[in-house]
Amino acid sequence: MSLSRSEEMHRLTENVYKTIMEQFNPSLRNFIAMGKNYEKALAGVTFAAKGYFDALVKMGELASESQGSKELGDVLFQMAEVHRQIQNQLEETLKSFHNELLTQLEQKVELDSRYLSAALKKYQTEQRSKGDALDKCQAELKKLRKKSQGSKNPQKYSDKELQYIDAISNKQGELENYVSDGYKTALTEERRRFCFLVEKQCAVAKNSAAYHSKGKELLAQKLPLWQQACADPNKIPDRAVQLMQQMANSNGSILPSALSASKSNLVISDPIPGAKPLPVPPELAPFVGRMSAQENVPVMNGVAGPDSEDYNPWADRKAAQPKSLSPPQSQSKLSDSYSNTLPVRKSVTPKNSYATTENKTLPRSSSMAAGLERNGRMRVKAIFSHAAGDNSTLLSFKEGDLITLLVPEARDGWHYGESEKTKMRGWFPFSYTRVLDSDGSDRLHMSLQQGKSSSTGNLLDKDDLALPPPDYGTSSRAFPTQTAGTFKQRPYSVAVPAFSQGLDDYGARSVSRNPFANVHLKPTVTNDRSAPLLS
């Protein structure tokens, strides 16, 4: 190898070292910085995913409490669990990305800058030393030749000249070998760094492949079952159908497990442990027995049964179903026996019930329209005595006691209030009380409770309305005769102001006769509260 060739290789070696220090290491630092940003973004995704699947679990809990969607709740739980496992695998990938790539690269790049500087300096020093030794031998040979040319006996310098020539040849070979080895070492150092980067990136890719493979395996196994569960949104589970049949066969008595849907969010302690029915006052027992036996088409919360489709935004497609198995009717039958609080509302079909028409128009609870004090609390007066027994959550009172209500609406026929006499608080049967008007006078109040309190007699916010008769279309001979002080019939129609004159003489009318026997309702789709057509 000529001297010019050796010098060229020496420059290439120096360029390799400088490329590593001036280009590779800065680029690697930038790569690490971008990797940290990527890691931070993945950590944010992990945090958001936890909140997302917590919300999915809550939706599953809601569905599992429903008689018609319990299996969909299980599906939502499975979805949350599968995605939790996938998310755990993603977290493992994130840990691998941090520990096996970013951390090690960051350590290497800090040590590498000092190592390369020392390696380049050592190479340059050694190369310079060998080059200086070669130059010195060449200078000595040149001097020796000048002496031999001016000497009378040049032969005596020939042996020494040969020695210098051999020394120069050896030193030049050493220099060339060293430069060649230095260039090879520089290329090796460069390749080792790129190989280290590729190796660590392969480890991350391996974990990423495991993450995607596990996700694919879990989803491929569960996805067909999930799709099958939601294939028919109009199908009612057999469990709910059997429950409705049991309710129909047992006159509305259902198992306590069906009553747990609306109990999970009570802030105050549950007033009905074990879903026990309320005690029946002896004065109202015949009346309740008659009404419970005649309920065929109940209305839940003032909304009609199968024909009420005013709010159904989730129904993408509607298949023809028997109305006896429709979800609204199953809900109404469930609410029909949801509470045995007395008196019980008698719901009839829209053809012979004006109250049902009112409920369709005004589904809100208006039992709070009267009895408010100046401070906004409603007061009621006990018309029957109630004993709490050993239950500390119930309120005991005697007939004639005044109670201040502490919650806005009754729950399953129970209300929460404070006795003004004993200053004790607790739950009590709302039907055992009578709402007080603002002037302090009391009136009979009937809690028409299905899921929540709803009073048909007060739907038009009239404070002077009395208790409605149990059935507008049935004969009055089946209704037991009551005294005016115990149970009064509602005269004429409470829904139309034009018939309010009937309130003046209703005391003179016989309470054993049903004044609505010949009343036919005028069908309407408006909210103008039209008067019934009397024939």
From Swiss-Prot:
PTM notes: Phosphorylated on tyrosine residues by INSR in response to insulin treatment.
Bilayer topology term: Peripheral membrane protein
Xref: Pfam families: IMD, SH3_2
Keyword line: Cell projection, Coiled coil, Cytoplasm, Cytoskeleton, Membrane, Phosphoprotein, SH3 domain
Coiled coil region boundaries: 88-153
SH3 domain boundaries: 375-438
IMD domain segment(s): 1-250
Spans annotated as Disordered: 299-370, 445-477
GO molecular function ontology, one term from the record: proline-rich region binding
Annotated compartments: Cytoplasm; Membrane; Cell projection, Filopodium; Cell projection, Ruffle
Tissues expressed in: Detected in liver, brain, olfactory bulb, brain cortex, caudate putamen, hypothalamus and cerebellum.
Biased composition, class Polar residues, residue ranges: 349-368, 447-458
Signal peptide (UniProt feature, chain positions): none
InterPro entries linked to this entry: AH/BAR_dom_sf, BAIP2_I-BAR_dom, BAIP2_SH3, I-BAR_dom, IRSp53/IRTKS/Pinkbar, SH3-like_dom_sf, SH3_domain
Modified residues (Phosphoserine): 262, 324, 326, 337, 347, 367, 385, 396, 455
GO CC terms in record: actin cytoskeleton; cytosol; dendritic shaft; dendritic spine cytoplasm; excitatory synapse; filopodium; glutamatergic synapse; lamellipodium
Ranges of Low complexity composition bias in the record: 321-335
Chain positions with Phosphothreonine modification: 341, 361
Main location: cytoplasm
Subunit structure: Homodimer. Interacts with CDC42 and RAC1 that have been activated by GTP binding. Binds DIAPH1. Interacts with ATN1, ADGRB1, SHANK1, SHANK2, SHANK3, TIAM1, WASF1 and WASF2. Interacts with ENAH after recruitment of CDC42. Interacts with EPS8.
Function: Adapter protein that links membrane-bound small G-proteins to cytoplasmic effector proteins. Necessary for CDC42-mediated reorganization of the actin cytoskeleton and for RAC1-mediated membrane ruffling. Involved in the regulation of the actin cytoskeleton by WASF family members and the Arp2/3 complex. Plays a role in neurite growth. Acts syngeristically with ENAH to promote filipodia formation. Plays a role in the reorganization of the actin cytoskeleton in response to bacterial infection. Participates in actin bundling when associated with EPS8, promoting filopodial protrusions.
Domain comment, as recorded: The IMD domain forms a coiled coil. The isolated domain can induce actin bundling and filopodia formation. In the absence of G-proteins intramolecular interaction between the IMD and the SH3 domain gives rise to an auto-inhibited state of the protein. Interaction of the IMD with RAC1 or CDC42 leads to activation.
Protein name: BAR/IMD domain-containing adapter protein 2
Taxonomic path: Eukaryota, Metazoa, Chordata, Craniata, Vertebrata
Protein encoded by which gene: Baiap2
